[in-house]
């Protein structure tokens, strides 16, 4: 994880400023059971999770999100998991394409409205992955995703942008 001065983190506006609003944010996070040492001066890493029992592409994300959180903690960050709409092609009618832009807007607004310094995107289907990236790209935050999207013969790795046969 790249080290930044705490005051250079985007999340500093939520937790580090000495004003009434930031006092409220710090109070709420303490009410959730976190101590100051858990989050103070650490980058807040959002984990946008499209887990759903009805989406066969995403059924394993519940466990994976916990593993991602452990990795963020180990790297010196403060993880915040946020749920997002899960697009399941076999069950959504008439098509998940109608909902792709909703997920993109939801992703952008989650990142805009919460104190995220970076984000891990958890999506794995042909509409979900582009939607997550469409929404996150507008924020200018560090983004990572470890999922392959694509058909049987070709796949696209979002974190590298390379095609593989």
Predicted regions and their residues:
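N-terminal amphipathic/basic leader segments beginning at the initiator methionine
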Residues: 1-42
């Amino acid at each position: 994880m790249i080290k930044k001065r705490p005051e250079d983190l985007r999340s500093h506006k939520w937790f580090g400023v000495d004003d009434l609003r930031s006092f409220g944010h710090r109070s709420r996070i303490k009410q959730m059971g976190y101590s100051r040492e858990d989050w103070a001066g650490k980058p807040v890493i959002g984990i946008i999770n499209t887990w759903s029992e009805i989406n066969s592409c995403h059924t394993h994300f519940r466990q994976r999100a916990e593993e991602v959180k452990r990795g963020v903690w180990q790297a010196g960050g403060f993880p915040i998991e946020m749920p997002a709409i899960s697009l399941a092609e076999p069950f959504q009618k008439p098509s998940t394409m109608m909902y792709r832009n909703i997920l993109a807007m939801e992703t952008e607004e989650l990142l805009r409205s919460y104190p995220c310094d970076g984000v891990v995107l958890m999506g794995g289907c042909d509409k979900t992955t582009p939607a997550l990236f469409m929404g996150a790209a507008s924020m200018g935050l560090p983004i990572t995703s470890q999922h392959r999207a694509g058909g049987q013969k070709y796949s696209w790795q979002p974190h590298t942008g390379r095609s593989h046969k």
